[in-house]
Every structure is written in C-alpha cells, then in structure tokens.
Amino acid sequence: RAMLTVRYTLSVKGWSQLDVSDTTIADLCWGQPIDSYLIHDSGPFRLPKFGYSRGFDKVFFLHGHETDHQYYAQDELGGGLKAEDYYEDHVMEKADEILGENVMRPLMNQVECHLKERQYWKSDGDQHAAQIMKEAVRNLERVDRNKSFFMWIDCFDPHEPWDAPSVYDPDLKCPYDPDYEGKDMFLPIQGHVDGLYTDRELEHIRALYAEKVTMVDKWFGHLMNNIRTLGMEDDTLVILVSDHGSPMGKGEHGHGIMRKCRPWPYEELAHIPMIMRGPGLPRNRRVRGFVQSCDVAPTVVDWLGIGVHPSMQGHSLLPLAKGDVEKVREFAIAGYFRYSWSIITEDWSFIHWLKDDEKSVADARFGIYGKDLGESTAHILQMKKANAVEDRDTAFYNRAYEEHKKAATLDGEDQWTCTAAASSEVPARDELYCRKDDPFQLNNVSAKHPEVAKELFEQLKLFMAELRAS
C-alpha cells in the first residue's frame, strides 16, 4: 500500500483495501502517454474489493499462491504425494500439543493444495517466480516503443512455501545443506520455535529459504537479460524491492519465532533490500541513506516525468541514487499498525510497544486483516449460503483466511494477521539497541541509556502525530 500510494500507512491502517481518496502510481499514469501493467501472483494483492489492480491498463494474475491456494483444492492429488511427508512426526505431535489442532489443519490444507498444483510442474521453469518473470517478458515484447510504460511485477516468491527445486527434484540436493537427511519442511509451522524444532531442522529450513531465493534470483536474471536483449537497458529504470523479511528461528535469525507471526519489527523482518538500476545511475554503489516503502512511488513518477506532488510523503530517490544528495531523511520508521512503532537512526534503533490507550485512530480496533477483510468478503459468503452449497470448498469467500482466523489466538476480527498461530504478543517494555554494536537487536540497552530512549521516543511520537494529522 505504501509503495503504491506514496504515503506512510503505519499510523493509519494495516493491510486493507484502497480508499477512494488514495492516489496510486497507476492513477497518476491515467491520461498520460504511459501504458501500465500489473503482473502478479499475490493472493493478498487481489482480495475481493481491495482494489489494488485499480487503474492498470493490463493485468495478469497467476493462481495458486498463499491465500489463493484453494484454487487447486478440488484437483486430484497423485504421484504418492502427501502433506504429512513434509513435516517431521515429532513436529506435528508437538504442534498439536503446544499450539492446538486448529494450527495444523490449515497448514496441512495449504500444503496439500500446493502439492496439487506442484504435481504439474516439470522443472523450476514452472515455479511461480519463473512464470511471473516469463509473463513480464512477454508483455515487454509487446510494449509500444513510442510510449513510456510502467510495469509492476509483484512476485510472491520467495515467500512461503519454501519449496526450492531440491524439494521436488529427486536428483537434486539443497546446495546450502546437501547432507541433510530429514524431511523438507518447506511450510514450517508458525510460532515460537523452542520445543518444536531442533536446531538442525531450523538450519535446514533456512537453507531451503536460501535455495528458494537463489531460484528467484535466477528468474529475475531472465527478466534482466531480456530487458538487455530487447534494447531497453539504456532507457529503463528497474527497482527491485521487497515488502518484508522473515523471522526464521532463534537469536539473530528470528528472535525465537518462525515466520511473520508476531508484530515484532526487528531487523530480520523490517530491513529489506532495495536495488535500483538505470541509465545515469552509478553502478556498484551502496547508499547508506535511509529509504522507505513510500519512496517507491515518488521515484517512479519522477522517472516517468509526471512530477512529485507536494502531498506525497515519500521522496524521489533519483537524487540519492545519482549521488546528488547523501540522504533524503534522518531516520526510518517501521512497525505494525496497533501494535508496534520503531524508529531507526544511524546509531540506534528504538521499538515502542503500543498500549491500549494509544490505539485510538478511527479504525484502530480492527487489526491488520481485520474488519476490512471480513466486510470485503461478506457478500460472497452470503451468496454461498443463499445457493446452499455449504459442502463445497469452491464457493470462494477466502476460505484460507477463514481457516487461519479460526486458528489465531485472538478472538473475532481483532487479530493482526491471517497466519495460523499468530498472536499480538508483544514485550512488556520498550527496547533500545545500538546498531553498531548490536545490529541484530539482541541486547536491549534502554536501561543503560535511558536518555537516548526517551529522546527517540519523543521523536517517534512527534513524527507519528504529524503523519496522523496529515
């Protein structure tokens, strides 16, 4: 949302539909000599009534990824594939004991649906990342060279499931863990890892993730090679950016949790890559200045010649990328709507865990994936009931979301994610970390430096108040 709408979202709402008042990059391209494309496989991006494809001239969606995996629910699963073959027995037993049966059920359902899709694959060229990049190339081949174009390629990989090539190809070994002999748990159970996984299992899960990233990198290279072959290299700006990282275990790997199941904006989740390549931009240069998701849209419209509007809260990064300026802001922020705010400076990172009396914006009582998602799918659910097809899984009302919602540890719609075993559990005290001595945020030094913590907290509160006011 922040990438498309040029505005910070942390102070306003979580993952929810676009508002009529939101202005996106595609909206700004309308009426201009610019063709716009959306190529994606992100289920959350196309939730009913969310409107993220709004304004794009051409849209391609590839079925099957998370929250859309029910697309394959009625396919027959052959080849001897079984969901339980991708979880260690002791993990399934402990998950039921520690987290409850409702946690395993939606996960097993998702794995089974994924296997029903995966059984059709012949090579890594059938993976979602490969199909998305090949579709992007097909559209690049057809662009009108007399016009500018804006292409948003939203590739859900390397998001879970981390089904890297070695998982489904018996002739391959994971290049980052070739000697592992256990099961490939490519969709690990979310939650605290203590008592659930062994250290060796966690190591292999991270190796599968690394292999999945390598696969995505290969197919991103396919896109870049075709940009060069098509003669677009000298007049096309390419921005590679992610929306979040992933906790994957103990210590610096994930602060004790697996996957995005707590509203904790630590380094492994909040520090994401942004790589830019384009004519006039120096090569092989790493920029230390802070950038944010809301800088993507101003950068794109600046490049397209539309101009950066004063109401945009983000900044065009072209001056920063060219070396004309050293920075566009003094600090960055991160966090989860309703649960956490974080401020990151050159020397420090500070995390404030919100209390109940601080959650008072208009729709704050509904967490991420809360009220908006429920309302947006309600009409489809009513249609399903009216047609009396209660026994069918194919009447789509985001069954995946409903399954995950049942498994969450919060009641009703007051939950912040549609991930099974997720909870709003947050630490009791705010946290301060020295970025130079402790880049992975493992040693809270707020008691040792209370004056620094107080100063950063005041700065953070002021900035969030300004965002709310604007």
Model-identified regions with their sequence ranges:
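Catalytic domains that recognize anionic headgroups
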Residues: 1-470
